[in-house]
Structures are given as C-alpha cells and as structure tokens.
C-alpha cells in the first residue's frame, strides 16, 4: 500500500512562485512540473485572479500566501496551490478589500507595492518605505521622475542574483530603473505586514532611503542628501 506522510512546509515571506514550487518539490509535496502547469493553466475560482490571464506560472505571483502549511505527501499540485490561495483569500479581509476599493487602486497594484516593500525591508520600516514608493509613483515631476529604482525588481529578472550596474539596462517592464511606475505585477509573495503597509503607508516627503552602517534605514527628501549619506557610510565605499 502507498504510505502517506504528513509534512509541514513553511513558505518564507518574500519567496517567488518559483522558489515556493522548488521548496514544495524538495519537500516531496508535488513536482515543479505539475505545480508550474497548474499555476499557469488552471482557472481558480477567486475574484482576485479573474483579470489575470492564464498561460504563465507567474500569474500567481503575490497570491501564494507565505505561511506554514500541512500537507500529506504526495499531493496533487491543484490541491496544494488552491490551499495557498484559500489562505490568501482568508488573510486578505473584506475590510482590506474595501480599503483597496477606496484607494482607487486594484488588488493587483496593492500586492505589487507590497511585494516591493517585502523585498526591500528586513522586517522594519515597511510603512515608511511604502511612503517612498507612493511618493515616487504619485509625483512624476519629482527628481525621481516616476522611476521606482528598486534593486529587487532587477533580481526578479536577472535570475535571482545580486544586481550589478549592467542589470539596470535589462529591457524588461519589471526594470524599475528603465520603466516608470509599477512593474506589471508582484515580484514575490508578500507577508501580511507588507500588505498592510501597502494599504496604509506613512505620510512623508521622503523619496530616497538607504541602509546605513548601523543597519537602519535612513530616509531622504532629495537626491543630494541621499548621495551625501552614501558617501559618509563605509558600506558604500569601493575597494
């Protein structure tokens, strides 16, 4: 008889769909191949997915909620993905949906912002980083000219490595150094704090931030202040 084992799989916040599927395969829950197929081609009955076209596994980016799940192994890819989507559907409350509605944005846009926050923070300052993102989006006449310039978007398109200067030339709508506004969709699956920050950002006049030698985020209104700070921090010196 085939033995079924129970396994707990913890999906870390900020993992991409590809990383989650790799983790599930490594945990013997389901194969990458099946998961990719079911992510790309199955039409899930959730209102938040209805406007996202089928055809690519990345259509679920942002919607596979990071949490600890219990699975019996092996399990069908359809069941596994559906379980994560159900969790997102629970966590993303009616109150949050009303907030999205009121903001004039879509759930997809809010999750895209949340995914940027998730990848840019170490678990602190989410709401202030959210303010920088929205300030840049909402004021295309600022020094930042509507460009988000977020390194994590380069990591999403360069195969997952630490970005280098040349990556800023990659021609992809996810390249926020090249293309203004939000990328086409989330770049990872954000946790609850990042989603909340995307819904309720702080109100600031900040357009820049950088991690200091003290491992704390410092925020700036102008490019000059930002550059001055970078010059004062040993972590940004060459050599």
What are the language-model segments listed below?
Residues 1-3, 47-48:
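Short, flexible domain-boundary/linker segments around small modular repeats
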Residues 2-29, 99-105:
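Glycine-rich loop/hinge motif
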Residues 14-17, 37-46:
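Acidic helix-start/capping segments at beta-turn-to-alpha-helix junctions
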Residues 22, 37, 228:
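DNA-binding alpha-helical recognition surfaces that contact promoter or target DNA
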Residues 25-41:
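A short alpha->loop->secondary-structure connector
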Residues 29-30, 43-239:
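Bacterial extracytoplasmic/cell-wall-associated proteins, especially those involved in peptidoglycan
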């Amino acid at each position: 008889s085939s033995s079924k084992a129970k396994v707990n799989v913890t999906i870390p916040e900020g993992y991409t769909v590809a990383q989650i599927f790799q983790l599930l395969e490594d945990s013997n829950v389901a194969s990458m191949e099946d998961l990719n197929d079911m992510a790309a081609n199955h039409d899930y009955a959730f209102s938040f997915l209805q406007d996202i076209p089928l055809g690519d596994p990345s259509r679920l980016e942002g919607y596979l909620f990071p949490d600890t799940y219990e699975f019996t192994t092996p399990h069908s890819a359809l069941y596994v993905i559906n379980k994560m989507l159900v969790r997102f559907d629970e966590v993303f409350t009616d109150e949050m949906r009303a907030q999205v509605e009121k903001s004039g944005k879509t759930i997809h846009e809010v999750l895209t912002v949340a995914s940027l926050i998730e990848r840019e923070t170490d678990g602190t300052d989410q709401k202030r980083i959210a303010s920088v993102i929205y300030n840049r989006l909402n004021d295309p006449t600022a020094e930042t000219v509507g460009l988000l310039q977020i390194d994590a978007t380069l990591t999403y398109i360069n195969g997952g490595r630490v970005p280098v200067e040349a990556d800023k030339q990659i021609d992809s709508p996810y390249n926020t150094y090249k293309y203004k506004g939000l990328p086409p969709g989330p770049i990872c699956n954000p946790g609850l704090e990042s989603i909340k920050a995307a819904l309720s950002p702080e109100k600031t006049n900040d357009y820049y931030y950088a991690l200091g030698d003290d491992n704390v985020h410092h925020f700036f209104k102008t490019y000059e202040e930002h550059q001055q700070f970078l010059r004062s921090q040993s972590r940004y010196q060459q050599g």
